[in-house]
Amino acid sequence: MDEMEELFGETADGLFAVDQNQRIVLWTAAAETLTGIKARDALGHPCHILEGRDEWGESICTKDCHIFQALRQGQPPPSDDLIVRRPDGRQVRMTFSVIPLQKGSAQAIIIFRENRLRGWQEIVDRAAAQLPAPPSTAALHVRLLGPLSLILQGCSLDSPPLTRPKVQKALKYLLAHYDRKVPKEVLMEFLWPEEDEEMGYRNLRVLVHTLKGALEPHRPPHQPSHFIGQEGGCYFFRMDAGVWIDVDAFQKHLREGEEAEKQGSPAQAIIHYEAAASLYRGEYLEEDLYEDWCAAERERLKELYISLLTKLSAFYAAAGHYEGAIDRLRQALAKDPCRESLHRNLMRYLWWAGQDTEALRQYEACRRSLAEELGIAPLPETTRLYQRIAQDLGDRRP
């Protein structure tokens, strides 16, 4: 063992060795640092003092566990990700690799490291520093997520013409369909469903003229609009004319985050997902919550928002940044208090962060939301997680 200590003692990865009876015979300084368990408390004890569990709280580190069964049978031992509770209450995700010392024997070296995204704090700081703002080159900044906001060259557009119900409704419809051309017949039916075609078209021409003037108060007479185009009987926003829309930017950041994930770059994915999350200031066209025409898009964007928050929470949890993971899940639950999978993940991350009591309270919050809103009870897997946390808390109480 002295030779092994000399060989492996300086490695940054945690390392310990066990004998035929699964008793720890070597425990390096890095193992102390990662687990919080001193060598004097580990040496001579069974290796299941680590109390490694899976993410559901089920014990994996047990006497004659599946790893040592494989060793004794001369089979390749599996590598596992385990959740290990440190003496300070914090739970950390570890990746373990097992090296047999002799075929058919339980003697082995176990190398482990904390499974976390390296440099997560730097990533979080970079994400915060790169939160998006409308580009200075954009003349018109439009926000549809949350209260409608239009900023023209630094000044808010809120002149009386834009507050007229029909003008504002037409403006919102064109902005909502910023990526396509809208036929005049569609606008006429949307704004004046009871009018005949002739009267509807007359009304539309007057309204569009008013809208152009409100968006460009200093446009010379008879000059074409810089922002609203007209072509082939269709109206549309000229996105190439310096128009920035938050929904467009939100979806671009989502796509770039997904692409970064595919390319194996979690740091870039986090930056883009955080950028997208910062753009979601509220419900899509929140002044029109009871309008059917934008309900489907509102729900779609909300689902995208919840999904990206869930991804961020998973990234942060993998990085050991449980505060960030917890915060993102709470933001997601604010949008959908009955999403049981969010409650479950939040319980798990609170538990891993050493906030066992808060994790149990989260189960009660989940149970109340489901009962009050849907008239149902939590799923068995949620209840099992609650019981596992409660048992763990009880086991550690004096």
Which residues does each PLM region occupy?
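Sensory modules in modular signal-transduction proteins
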Residues: 1-32
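DNA-recognition element of transcription regulators
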Residues: 147, 162-172, 197-219
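Short loop/turn elements at sensory-signaling interfaces that couple input to output
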Residues: 96-109, 115-118
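Terminal output helix/cap of sensory domains in signal transduction proteins
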Residues: 49-90, 382
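PAS/PAS-like sensory domain cap-loop motif
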Residues: 31-46
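Short amphipathic alpha-helical recognition elements used for nucleic-acid or partner binding
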Residues: 158-191, 211, 251, 340-346
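Short boundary/linker motifs that mark transitions into or out of structured domains
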Residues: 117-168, 225-235
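Intrinsically disordered, charged and Pro/Gly-enriched terminal/linker segments
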Residues: 176, 196-199, 220, 232-398
